[in-house]
Amino acid sequence: MKASTVLQIAYLVSQESKCCSWKVGAVIEKNGRIISTGYNGSPAGGVNCCDYAAEQGWLLNKPKHAIIQGHKPECVSFGSTDRFVLAKEHRSAHSEWSSKNEIHAELNAILFAARNGSSIEGATMYVTLSPCPDCAKAIAQSGIKKLVYCETYDKNKPGWDDILRNAGIEVFNVPKKNLNKLNWENINEFCGE
């Protein structure tokens, strides 16, 4: 499969995330076949991010007309036409909660492959957002030999890519403008203000 196709599949996988901030998807491909996918979220049985954020009052109702005025796309829909986004002033509180309660897409994809007995030695990982340093270390240890990502995480510390390159992993960026099979109006990524 072409890198642009698999990366767009990663964006579709990201839509399963219940995170009210970033929806991230990862796909592990080997020999032209998808062997694992993952998205960011709470471990099975845990409280979903969007539910916790709603309980804490971190979400703002942004009707559809507000999106046209420059706000980010919908994040959470509670069975109505209302749309909710993470309020900017709660982003740091969300990050603290997320770091304790959510697993990143990259790690979920690696864990699901292991759980299913699929070798990822020599595989390629496609991810919608650049990995954090901890995920970069997990990728470096996993046997993956190539990482393809689309967007750069705005809070990422420099050096995540050095972790991968120092482990002999090729790192490639595919700009979003090269991904033309999806209707981007229907894909939610960052759900904050």
Swiss-Prot record:
Instruction: Relay the activity regulation note.
Output: Allosteric enzyme whose activity is greatly influenced by the end products of its metabolic pathway, dCTP and dTTP.
Q: Where is the CMP/dCMP-type deaminase domain?
A: 1-171
Output the Gene3D superfamilies linked to this UniProt entry.
Cytidine Deaminase, domain 2
Which InterPro entries does this one have?
APOBEC/CMP_deaminase_Zn-bd (IPR016192), CMP_dCMP_dom (IPR002125), Cytidine_deaminase-like (IPR016193), dCMP_deaminase (IPR016473), dCMP_deaminase-rel (IPR015517), Deoxycytidylate_deaminase_dom (IPR035105)
Record keywords: Allosteric enzyme, Hydrolase, Metal-binding, Nucleotide biosynthesis, Zinc
Where does the chain bind Zn(2+) 2? H104, C132, C135
What's its EC? Answer: 3.5.4.12
Q: Where does substrate bind?
A: Y153
Active site (catalytic residues): E106
Q: Which reaction does it catalyse?
A: dCMP + H2O + H(+) = dUMP + NH4(+)
Q: How is the cofactor bound?
A: Binds 2 Zn(2+) ions per subunit.
Cofactor(s) listed: Zn(2+)
Biological role stated in the UniProt entry: Supplies the nucleotide substrate for thymidylate synthetase.
Oligomer and partners: Homohexamer.
- Protein name as annotated: Deoxycytidylate deaminase
The coding gene here is: CD
